């Protein structure tokens, strides 16, 4: 049985941990609102760009003049998995769920005889993937020094991706991130960004007819590389909101668990102390009777 001193130290230790988890929960809650607003603000722009590019691509593909970012390289042997995770832990299953989805995709592709490589954004995803695929990781982007995410961060990543495409490093690129729904719901998502996949547009009778100036080919040549950066930026913002939501939930659970443990240890402490007092009283009474 633990001594009273051990129990007091244990209770004090759990209380100190509870203060830390409570503080982290409050910080995550404060940052979540700003991150959620940024993620929600980026969605309409990214979705609208997809719509515009889908309309443009429909005419170009039909004419057989589609650029490589839409038509692809003509092969699907080499796959690049762009895995975006967080730089820190203590956030529940946020990082693990994204990496799990990427691993499942990698195992499927390798089983089909495809060549798979990883482009990691975030230290936590890199640390997990290098245990299983140490020789398949070709790039790591560390964002720990970035205080506020900007479009330039995504643009720099997109430039590296496009350079790898020009070098023939891959044929298909799939982006992995966590789609923020709510504090308790973040959905791991896989999105193919090269070649781009656009949702089919419903062209009913009487629908709008678009005319583009300059030519569609010139617009696509400018917008398609930017769209890669836009989709990556959106994924980074969704990840940021998902991280804080998951961290807030995880720290709330940790704080509650610490409270339960404090109650349990306090009960054990009181029972142990009561038993020791009772034992001492019995010894005193027994000694008095012996006299």
From Swiss-Prot:
Belongs to the ATPase gamma chain family. The gene is atpG. Disulfide bonds: none annotated. Produces ATP from ADP in the presence of a proton gradient across the membrane. The gamma chain is believed to be important in regulating ATPase activity and the flow of protons through the CF(0) complex. This is ATP synthase gamma chain. GO terms for molecular function: ATP binding; proton-transporting ATP synthase activity, rotational mechanism. Keywords: ATP synthesis, Cell inner membrane, Cell membrane, CF(1), Hydrogen ion transport, Ion transport, Membrane, Transport. The keyword Transferase does not apply. It comes from Xanthobacter autotrophicus (strain ATCC BAA-1158 / Py2). Pfam families: ATP-synt (PF00231). GO terms for biological process: proton motive force-driven plasma membrane ATP synthesis. PANTHER family: ATP SYNTHASE GAMMA CHAIN (PTHR11693), ATP SYNTHASE SUBUNIT GAMMA, MITOCHONDRIAL (PTHR11693:SF22). It is a peripheral membrane protein. One of its GO terms (cellular component) is proton-transporting ATP synthase complex. It comes from the Bacteria. InterPro entries: ATP_synth_F1_ATPase_gsu, ATP_synth_F1_gsu, ATP_synth_F1_gsu_CS. F-type ATPases have 2 components, CF(1) - the catalytic core - and CF(0) - the membrane proton channel. CF(1) has five subunits: alpha(3), beta(3), gamma(1), delta(1), epsilon(1). CF(0) has three main subunits: a, b and c. NCBIfam families: ATPsyn_F1gamma, PRK05621.1-4. It is found in: Cell inner membrane.
């Amino acid at each position: 049985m633990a001594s009273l001193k051990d129990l007091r130290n244990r209770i004090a230790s759990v209380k100190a941990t509870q203060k830390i988890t409570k503080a982290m929960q409050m910080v995550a809650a404060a940052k979540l609102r700003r991150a959620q607003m940024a993620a929600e603000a980026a969605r309409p722009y990214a979705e609208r760009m997809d719509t515009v590019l889908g309309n443009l691509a429909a005419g170009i593909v039909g004419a057989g003049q589609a650029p490589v970012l839409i038509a692809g390289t003509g092969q699907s042997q080499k796959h690049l998995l762009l895995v975006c995770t967080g730089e820190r832990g203590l956030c529940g299953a946020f990082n693990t769920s994204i990496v799990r989805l990427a691993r499942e995709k990698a195992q499927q592709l390798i089983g089909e005889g495809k060549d798979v490589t990883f482009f990691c954004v975030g230290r936590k995803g890199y640390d997990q993937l290098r245990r299983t695929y140490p020789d398949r990781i070709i790039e790591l982007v560390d964002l720990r020094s970035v205080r506020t995410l900007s479009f330039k961060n995504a643009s720099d990543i997109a430039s590296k991706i496009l350079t790898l495409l020009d070098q023939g490093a891959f044929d298909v690129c799939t982006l992995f991130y966590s789609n923020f729904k709510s504090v308790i719901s973040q959905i791991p998502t896989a999105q193919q960004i090269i070649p781009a996949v656009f949702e089919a547009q419903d062209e009913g009778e009487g629908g709008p007819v678009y005319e583009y100036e300059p030519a569609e080919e010139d617009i696509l040549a400018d917008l398609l590389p930017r769209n890669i950066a836009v989709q990556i930026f959106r994924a980074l913002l969704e990840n940021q909101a998902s991280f804080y939501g998951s961290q807030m939930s995880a720290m709330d659970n940790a704080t509650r668990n610490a409270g339960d443990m404090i109650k349990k240890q306090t009960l054990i402490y009181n029972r142990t102390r009561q038993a020791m007092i009772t034992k001492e009283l019995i010894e005193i009474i027994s000694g008095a009777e012996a006299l």
